[in-house]
Amino acid sequence: MSLKQLGSLTLVALCLAACSSSGGGSSNNLNAPDTGNNNNANNKHADKSVPKLLKVSDLREDTEEDLERAFHSPVPVKLSSYAVKINGKTYTDGDIDYATLGNGLKRVDVVETASANINGQTHNVTRNSKLHLYQQPYSIVTFMQTTGGQVGSLGKIEKGEFKSSYFLGQATETLPSAGSFNYKGVAFNEKEQGKLDYTINFDTKKGAGSISGLNQTGKITLHESNITKIWDDGFEKYTHYGVEEGKATSEKQGNVTYDLGIFGPNADEVSGTVSQGNKDLAGFGGKKQ
């Protein structure tokens, strides 16, 4: 029996500085390298990385829900034990701090192990995944792809799709009132790394750009879209400025859409994703030049 239902591990949203200002997040600031391209002399926090914390207890609950759905359990699935290993470090409780993985594009191994009571029987569960993330001091965009695993004698876990988990960060509270900013950075998919070039005109509150260097999609044109205030109703509910389902065109895959957020105290960064319907194609992030 193959378990396609478990082929996509969903990570809950991180509690970042956008929510810590209201008392919901960590009070600790994490040191991170300076972006090196910050032209705003008044930005005294460019060398600080916002907290990027993930609760192990939330991952444990997600695993219970995934198993319950996969096996149509009439009663809630409960884990008697749970551990997750990320980049070689094992966690059984507390928080996982993604900032320790460093800025830039990372592809990190994730292994979850658990003991689960499913329909009255105890099974040892192992799920292997690859975490793809692009991290900047003020933002992060992540994708998770299950690579395999086993649920006791019930069957194997198949390889899953390249799925977006989230893009979040310290949301820009007040947009610049005028001027155009160009953002350059990285775009990525399951195996490739490309480039992002995006420009926002804050006079007109519109943005447009392109992604290049990804053979799977070819060049992606991110068509001009309105910059608006967006309500995010995910795990950490908050608002941010950006683009919601903007129109885009892929050379190889036709019409696609993109979502983009603006992050940092001075609109320092952008991060986002490109998708086609329910299929996630790429993530991206860039900093102000």
Features from the language model and the residues they span:
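Mature soluble binding/inhibitory domains
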Residues: 20-289
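C-terminal motif of bacterial Sec signal peptides marking the signal peptidase cleavage site
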Residues: 15-18
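Bacterial Sec-dependent N-terminal signal peptides
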Residues: 1-7
